[in-house]
């Protein structure tokens, strides 16, 4: 299990764009399972939507991508690198995510060749799928 400080040692995201609160499981280079506690205080709820708060789907996908990045960047040879979002395929949103929900974010890396990889990503709330997608990423170096 990884807490928020340990997550911040692996990926560069910070508030308000760090969308993973904890990691429950990680198999380096293979898969990871994370949690995002969706609070009524999230900044994005101010505009999406003021009268009926719904977490934007693109942020659910971004949260999944961050969990996938943790899975690949936890691997020893990738430490200190960056994982860039490369693409989304077959993305479907099945249910709304509202304040008070706990998102369970699961990403299984299905193919990694050189600096390019793909993963099967599934987000659930209370065991029900809210989003699923195939995500593509590219590993890169930090440039000073």
UniProtKB/Swiss-Prot annotation:
The active site is at residue 48. Keywords: Cytoplasm, Lipid A biosynthesis, Lipid biosynthesis, Lipid metabolism, Lyase. The keyword Lyase applies. GO terms for biological process: fatty acid biosynthetic process; lipid A biosynthetic process. It comes from the Bacteria. Its main location: cytoplasm. GO terms for cellular component: cytoplasm; membrane. Its EC number is 4.2.1.59. It catalyses: a (3R)-hydroxyacyl-[ACP] = a (2E)-enoyl-[ACP] + H2O. InterPro entries: FabA_FabZ (IPR013114), FabZ (IPR010084), HotDog_dom_sf (IPR029069). It is found in: Cytoplasm. The keyword Lipoprotein does not apply. GO terms for molecular function: (3R)-hydroxyacyl-[acyl-carrier-protein] dehydratase activity. Belongs to the thioester dehydratase family. FabZ subfamily. HAMAP family: FabZ. Involved in unsaturated fatty acids biosynthesis. Catalyzes the dehydration of short chain beta-hydroxyacyl-ACPs and long chain saturated and unsaturated beta-hydroxyacyl-ACPs. NCBIfam families: fabZ, PRK00006.1. This is 3-hydroxyacyl-[acyl-carrier-protein] dehydratase FabZ. The lineage of its organism: Bacteria, Bacillati, Bacillota, Bacilli, Bacillales.
């Amino acid at each position: 299990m990884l807490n928020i400080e340990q997550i911040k040692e692996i990926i560069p995201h910070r508030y308000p764009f760090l969308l993973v609160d904890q990691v429950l499981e990680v198999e380096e280079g293979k898969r990871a399972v994370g949690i995002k506690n969706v609070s009524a205080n999230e900044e994005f709820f101010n505009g999406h939507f003021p009268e009926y708060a719904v977490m934007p789907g693109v942020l659910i996908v971004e949260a999944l991508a961050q969990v996938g990045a943790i899975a690949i960047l936890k691997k020893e040879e990738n430490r200190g690198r960056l994982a860039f979002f490369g693409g989304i395929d077959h993305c479907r949103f099945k249910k709304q995510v509202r304040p008070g929900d706990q998102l369970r974010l699961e990403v299984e890396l299905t193919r990694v060749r050189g600096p390019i990889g793909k993963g099967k990503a599934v987000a659930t709330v209370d065991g029900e799928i809210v989003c699923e997608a195939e995500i593509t990423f590219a590993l890169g170096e930090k440039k000073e």
